[in-house]
């Protein structure tokens, strides 16, 4: 059965694929978006696919290595500037966050519901694993990451518990960490609250984002995408939590809206918009949520590159 990504139809409509265009799928995953783009491309079209995850790249090579329209590169979309010349792309797609295969395979170490090694790296060959990071850093740094990237209100208590636990035995397994966090939450007044999410959800999110430099890569990748898009080209981004969506929303706004001016100062027209927001933020409808509950938090935003005069070519 072919994998259908979250907000697939809306993403394809947002990209507005042209037959001979050149496109980037910066987060290949299982290839659902890439297949959608290729179905609309003619023989003269081109598709660059990227992913941090070597397993995703291996899947891309199995599926598309014989297609002359496809170029496959292993790496973060933050490296886009090294691969695409300025104004060379007609569309860029980023489908952010962790992919279903990463969550569903315990050995990848992303899931608090399935026991596996505490890894969380999208590229297992790059940087520290979550276990290595938690074993090395201070209580304060752990708390800061849980608060900043996980928006976890109990970040200090959880960090304190992690440091106390690791003094006696190493934290090496996902369920080991999840149970420790759950025990901390049960000892607080928040433990009695009924929540739809697991008590370790926010902490796992925060650690994962930090280990993979997700928000740093997003900021760099958005700027690179803007530079690489031709006038009239489309930027389509699907985010899955408020931190990602805030960065995307602010990026589009910063490049599309005239900043406020001081009425007491002489008016000098220096701002030239580079993007035009296309419609409002899009969320999954009830029909999609019935098929894919993971789509509940997804938000899709679309923007269009303008020319230097502020008009679409």
Swiss-Prot record:
Its main location: cytoplasm. It comes from the Bacteria. Signal peptide: none annotated. It catalyses: cytidine(1402) in 16S rRNA + S-adenosyl-L-methionine = N(4)-methylcytidine(1402) in 16S rRNA + S-adenosyl-L-homocysteine + H(+). Keywords: Cytoplasm, Methyltransferase, rRNA processing, S-adenosyl-L-methionine, Transferase. Gene3D superfamilies: Putative methyltransferase TM0872, insert domain (1.10.150.170), Vaccinia Virus protein VP39 (3.40.50.150). The keyword DNA-binding does not apply. Its EC number is 2.1.1.199. GO terms for biological process: rRNA base methylation. It holds the Pfam family Methyltransf_5. One of its GO terms (cellular component) is cytoplasm. NCBIfam families: 16S rRNA (cytosine(1402)-N(4))-methyltransferase RsmH (TIGR00006). Specifically methylates the N4 position of cytidine in position 1402 (C1402) of 16S rRNA. This is Ribosomal RNA small subunit methyltransferase H. The gene is rsmH.
